[in-house]
């Protein structure tokens, strides 16, 4: 009888070698998951979902007032509706100059950390005021595998230009000479659903009304640029997007 290496014996040999090469597989254990990227050096606030049935993770980049009334209230409203939120404090993060590419990589870290940790599939990107100016730059620079998971971008009170460092003069409405135009970055987000919220008294200043008709879903709300407690229409617009059955 020919005792050569038959296909059946070859298959058995390869399987045996694979089991010895991987003790976890030999023991019937699944392979260990890759470690989550660290986010300890970022000024983040965790607001876990308080209801089940939704698969979105929202990242909220705050205004230059930091984690304040509007950011807290909007995040809590979304969490009650089942959307987990990671708040990102712009005031602390942009105290030193950043650049769009580096900030986009930090957003990538946040998503690669919290998507698997909280078992979420889709991404909602929210920016308020200063954060709304910056968020399109970050969204347009995400790697393809994360970009395709972005189901909604919500911009609350965006202006024409963005700066990547906080200047106290901006509280007086004075743009920095280093600011960058926001419109070209929004144009890079073709195909993404965008919600743009603005105060009814800031119609002549908001970027929302300068965007091409039909490009975004407009959400007018009472008042001026400062949202305060008037975040209800914004929360409803976000919660009404992509609702999944529980």
Language model feature labels by segment:
Residues 11-22:
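Bacterial N-terminal signal peptides
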Residues 97-118, 137:
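Alpha/beta-hydrolase active-site loop
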Residues 48-81, 89-90:
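Short, surface-exposed "cap/lid" segments of acyl-processing enzymes
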Residues 215-246:
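C-terminal catalytic histidine-bearing segment of alpha/beta-hydrolase fold enzymes
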Residues 27-53:
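N-terminal cap/lid segment of alpha/beta-hydrolase-fold proteins
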Residues 84, 89-94, 159, 224:
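Short beta-to-alpha linker loops that shape the active-site pocket of alpha/beta-hydrolase fold enzymes
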Residues 113, 122-177:
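Primarily recognizes the serine-hydrolase "nucleophile elbow" in alpha/beta-hydrolase
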Residues 163-213:
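The feature captures the conserved acid-bearing segment of alpha/beta-hydrolase catalytic domains
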């Amino acid at each position: 009888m020919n005792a050569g290496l038959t296909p059946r014996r070859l298959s058995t040999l390869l399987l045996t070698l694979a089991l010895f090469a991987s003790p976890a597989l030999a023991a019937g254990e699944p392979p260990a998951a890759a470690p989550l990227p660290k986010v300890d050096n970022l000024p983040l606030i965790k607001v876990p979902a308080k209801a089940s049935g939704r698969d979105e993770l929202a990242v909220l980049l705050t205004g230059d007032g930091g984690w304040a009334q509007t950011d807290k209230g909007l995040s809590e409203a979304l969490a009650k509706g089942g959307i987990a939120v990671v708040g990102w404090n712009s005031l602390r993060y942009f105290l030193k100059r950043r650049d769009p590419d580096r900030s986009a990589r930090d957003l990538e870290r946040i998503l690669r950390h919290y998507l698997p940790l909280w078992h979420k599939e889709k991404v909602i990107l929210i920016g308020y005021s200063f954060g709304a100016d910056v968020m399109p730059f970050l969204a347009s620079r995400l790697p393809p595998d994360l970009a395709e998971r972005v189901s909604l971008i919500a911009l609350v009170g965006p202006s024409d230009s963005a700066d990547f460092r906080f200047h106290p003069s901006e509280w007086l409405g004075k743009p920095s000479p280093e600011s960058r135009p926001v419109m070209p970055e929004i144009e890079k987000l073709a195909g993404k659903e965008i919600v743009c919220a603005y105060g009814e008294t800031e119609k002549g200043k908001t970027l929302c009304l300068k965007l091409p008709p039909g490009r975004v879903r407009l959400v007018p709300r009472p008042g001026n640029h400062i949202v305060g407690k008037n975040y209800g229409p914004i929360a409803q617009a976000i919660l009404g997007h992509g609702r999944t059955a529980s």
